[in-house]
Amino acid sequence: MFAPIDPVKIPVVSNPWITMGTLIGYLLFVLKLGPKIMEHRKPFHLNGVIRIYNIFQILYNGLILVLGVHFLFVLKAYQISCIVSLPMDHKYKDRERLICTLYLVNKFVDLVETIFFVLRKKDRQISFLHVFHHFAMAFFGYLYYCFHGYGGVAFPQCLLNTAVHVIMYAYYYLSSISKEVQRSLWWKKYITIAQLVQFAIILLHCTITLAQPNCAVNRPLTYGCGSLSAFFAVIFSQFYYHNYIKPGKKSAKQNKN
């Protein structure tokens, strides 16, 4: 089993049995067990719980974002052109560990969203994109932590992700207030656009990093980050096309006829 290389470990998450068991349990519940349990039951009304969850996610991701921006641009702990993890004896190493720990733990908190979908019988939202995205972010985040430790090339990429999540969960919270408020929110599709921009920036960042022969990053992991972002860009583009472009073309064709 994988063992983290940094001597300072994340409680619970650093245990490979608990982590992998959680991820396998997540897949089993959302794809098989959960729908089976809910098959002959009425959907749960979880509006209050979901609002609290959304507020928590806004505050949690906002905290990571503020800490990360301060770390990058105020403390200037990294050389932006070539971001490598801080050495073990660096004065800001504990801060790097804290920010990365908060981020990785949040990827497991994100899994709760799919469980809400199952309990509310929102089967349409339990798509391949949704499940794979949540699973992959937690799984590959854990692998990065095991094989690389804290920080490094993925650090600014994670901050981009938290910024998008603040916007996304703000939308979720506002849309949960009432149907009238939900209908007035015109910027839903721009969340997907923000995600696509995020993946493009990550891919560009990985490419620029790898193009520097003297940049001592972990190259296999940097290739992995770039490849995963490219794959996400493809499946999110497909989602955007089928949900926002294709319906518009169909509507225009019907109006023309």
Curated annotation (Swiss-Prot):
Q: Pfam families from the entry?
A: ELO (PF01151)
Recorded GO molecular functions are: fatty acid elongase activity
Q: What is its main location?
A: endoplasmic reticulum
> Where is this chain's protein located in or outside the cell?
Endoplasmic reticulum membrane
> Which Enzyme Commission numbers does its entry carry?
2.3.1.199
Gene Ontology terms, cellular component aspect? endoplasmic reticulum membrane
GO BP: courtship behavior; fatty acid elongation; fatty acid elongation, monounsaturated fatty acid; fatty acid elongation, polyunsaturated fatty acid; fatty acid elongation, saturated fatty acid; pheromone metabolic process; sphingolipid biosynthetic process; very long-chain fatty acid biosynthetic process
Q: Where are the transmembrane segments?
A: 10-30, 55-75, 98-118, 135-155, 158-178, 191-211, 221-241
User: How does this chain sit within the bilayer?
Assistant: Multi-pass membrane protein
Q: Which InterPro entries match?
A: ELO_CS, ELO_fam
Which pathway is recorded for this entry?
Lipid metabolism; fatty acid biosynthesis
Q: In which tissues is it expressed?
A: Highly expressed in females. Little or no expression detected in males.
Null mutant phenotype reads:
RNAi-mediated knockdown results in an altered hydrocarbon profile in females, with significantly increased levels of C25 7,11-dienes and reduced levels of C27 7,11-dienes. Monounsaturated and saturated hydrocarbon levels are also affected with increased levels of C23 fatty acids and reduced levels of C27 fatty acids. Males have a normal hydrocarbon profile. RNAi-mediated knockdown in females (mated to wild-type males) results in impaired courtship behavior with reduced numbers of copulation attempts and increased copulation latency.
Q: Which reaction does it catalyse?
A: a very-long-chain acyl-CoA + malonyl-CoA + H(+) = a very-long-chain 3-oxoacyl-CoA + CO2 + CoA
Which UniProt keywords are listed? Behavior, Endoplasmic reticulum, Fatty acid biosynthesis, Fatty acid metabolism, Lipid biosynthesis, Lipid metabolism, Membrane, Transferase, Transmembrane, Transmembrane helix
Family to which this protein belongs: Belongs to the ELO family.
Q: What does this protein do?
A: Condensing enzyme that elongates saturated and monounsaturated very long chain fatty acids, to yield products up to 30 carbons in length. May also elongate diunsaturated fatty acids. Important for courtship behavior where it probably has a role in female pheromone biosynthesis.
PANTHER family attached to this UniProt entry: ELONGATION OF VERY LONG CHAIN FATTY ACIDS PROTEIN-RELATED, FATTY ACID ACYL TRANSFERASE-RELATED
Name used for this protein in its record:
Very long chain fatty acid elongase F
Q: What lineage is on file?
A: Eukaryota, Metazoa, Ecdysozoa, Arthropoda, Hexapoda
